[in-house]
């Protein structure tokens, strides 16, 4: 059945409207991405300073091993996973890569579902797991595009507290790491116990730089939970940056596809119009010949 010229014109107009919407969403995502990247850079400066301070306190000046439980691996009976996804769609494969990886982790390490504890940041992840009968210990929805620490403080502090209370024996964060506008990397990073403070980076003469007014263990008791919380917050910022990049790329792809559809429909319209004109000319000539 031939498509009428009016139908094609309607499709062109509708696709143009969609293209304008996706183009606007692309520009909004680009603005969000710029702010997220700046926040991520600022956090990295802070994180490097705190990591260096902790490393110096732990390993500098010939310090012995700490007995703080946040630094000591224990027998693993339960593992906690913080899964960071978005609250909405329109972000390409951003969520699917995370959810697929977490399900693979579950099948490999927790095939019977035992010892698998989850904290969800983002509604897409929470809904995905609930639909499969997996109830998160805690969930957070409605995260801002540039979340402040105050917005996530409760869930982060609660998670670290659950580790300290041995609700699980190790903690991982599953999220997409932002590489650039077109690329992100799925990461599963261990947060607790803290194991990535390299002794080789310690300042052997740190005592000449600052003097501890209380014992090292008392300082670590306060500093280590704050460090763990800040590292989780850093992963959230990183994930949000990757989400904004994915949203921008998805909307750019949608806009490009809409332009291609408009071009194809325009060609179809011109051909149909040409065929209609040819048909009219043929009918006029045939009518004139019949009158002779």
UniProtKB/Swiss-Prot annotation:
Would the keyword Signal be found if you checked this record's keyword annotation? no
Q: Which family does it belong to?
A: Belongs to the ATPase gamma chain family.
Tell me yes or no: is Ion transport among this UniProt entry's keywords: yes
Report the function annotation for this chain. Produces ATP from ADP in the presence of a proton gradient across the membrane. The gamma chain is believed to be important in regulating ATPase activity and the flow of protons through the CF(0) complex.
| One Pfam family this sequence matches | ATP-synt
Q: Which PANTHER family match?
A: ATP SYNTHASE GAMMA CHAIN, ATP SYNTHASE SUBUNIT GAMMA, MITOCHONDRIAL
- What is the protein's quaternary organization? F-type ATPases have 2 components, CF(1) - the catalytic core - and CF(0) - the membrane proton channel. CF(1) has five subunits: alpha(3), beta(3), gamma(1), delta(1), epsilon(1). CF(0) has three main subunits: a, b and c.
Q: What is this protein called?
A: ATP synthase gamma chain
Annotated keywords? ATP synthesis, Cell membrane, CF(1), Hydrogen ion transport, Ion transport, Membrane, Transport
Where does this one sit in the cell? Cell membrane
Example of a GO MF term: ATP binding
Q: State the membrane topology.
A: Peripheral membrane protein
Tell me, which GO biological process terms does this entry list? proton motive force-driven plasma membrane ATP synthesis
A single Gene Ontology CC annotation of this entry is: proton-transporting ATP synthase complex
């Amino acid at each position: 059945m031939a498509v009428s010229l009016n139908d094609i014109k309607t499709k062109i107009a509708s696709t143009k409207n969609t293209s304008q919407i996706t183009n606007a969403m692309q520009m909004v995502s680009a603005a969000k991405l710029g702010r997220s990247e700046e926040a991520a850079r600022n956090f990295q400066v802070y994180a490097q300073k705190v990591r260096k301070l902790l490393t110096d306190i732990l390993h500098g000046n010939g310090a012995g091993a700490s007995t703080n439980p946040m630094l000591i691996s224990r027998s693993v009976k339960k593992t906690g996973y913080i899964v960071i996804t978005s609250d909405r769609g329109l972000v390409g494969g951003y969520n699917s890569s995370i959810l697929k990886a977490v399900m693979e982790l579950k099948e490999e390490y927790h095939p019977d579902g035992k010892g698998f504890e989850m904290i969800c940041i983002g509604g897409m992840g929470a809904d995905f797991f609930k639909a499969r009968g997996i109830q998160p210990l805690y969930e957070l929805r409605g995260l801002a595009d540039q979340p402040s620490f105050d917005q996530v403080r409760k869930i982060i502090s609660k998670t670290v507290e659950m580790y300290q209370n041995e609700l699980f024996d190790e903690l991982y964060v599953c999220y997409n790491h932002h590489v650039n506008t077109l690329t992100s990397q799925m990461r599963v990073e261990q947060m607790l116990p803290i194991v990535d403070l390299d002794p080789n980076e310690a300042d052997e003469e740190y005592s000449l730089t600052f003097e501890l007014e209380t014992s090292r263990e008392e300082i670590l008791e306060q500093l280590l939970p704050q460090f763990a919380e800040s590292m989780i917050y850093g992963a959230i910022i990183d994930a949000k940056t990757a989400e904004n990049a994915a949203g921008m790329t998805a909307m750019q792809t949608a806009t490009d596809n809409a332009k291609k559809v408009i071009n194809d429909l325009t060609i179809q319209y011109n051909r149909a119009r040409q065929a209609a004109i040819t048909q009219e000319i043929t009918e006029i000539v045939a009518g004139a010949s019949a009158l002779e």
